[in-house]
Amino acid sequence: MAGRIRTLLAIGDIRGEVEPLKRVFEKLPETGADAVAVIGDLGVAWSKADIYRAIFRTLGEAGRPTFWVPGPIDAPLDDYLREAHNMEIAFPSLHGVHGTAAQADGQLLFAGMGGEIVDDPDAKRAEETLLRYPGWEVEYRLKIIREFKDRRLVFLFTTPPAHKGLHGPGSDVLAELIKTYNPRLVLVRGDGVAEERIGKSLVVSPGRLDQREYALVDLQELTVEAAEPAARTAV
């Protein structure tokens, strides 16, 4: 789908539930969403390839530019990456941005890091039983952002940044990263649809799709609308 991205459909914690995702996309035309962003967890613990395949196929068939990062339990990483690679070939609108970045609409840059981010520089990274990374690795892998200084930046993280307004534990490294790069929008994992500001950056939790929550974000006005999937039709 070509054209400028203004309205972003933000989804968190699919947790392997493909049917609620399909119901969200049934309402896609009326939402006016130009693109989709997904914060893991995508599957459940030790999800098989067919779960990831079904999720990515549903995202691809929605026909919108889509960007995502995996959650802490989307491990082993090899299984997730294999299916992401295959489905990004089948659906060019799909863009995983775990530890990397992807351009969109000539103006936006989506970048992020999934898994649990740990501030301790001596923390061991993990990708087999869960996804966990030391904060310095996030800083290193996302330095690619410096090559796109003229782009409006959107961050995707499954670990929230440290901030008193977010009412929970968070990463000081990610908070500093946000202050350094000044993204327009930061999407983070969390319970319930919520928003906060770190400097000029809007930080949004889209809630959990497995709890029938998601959000619409206006990237121009920086406003957030909580929404829920269409109800299942009785049979």
Could you describe each region identified by the protein language model?
Residues 1-9, 101-112, 150-154, 197-203, ...:
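Beta-strand-turn-beta hairpins that frame and shape the catalytic cleft
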Residues 13, 36, 41, 71, ...:
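Divalent metal-coordination and catalytic microenvironments
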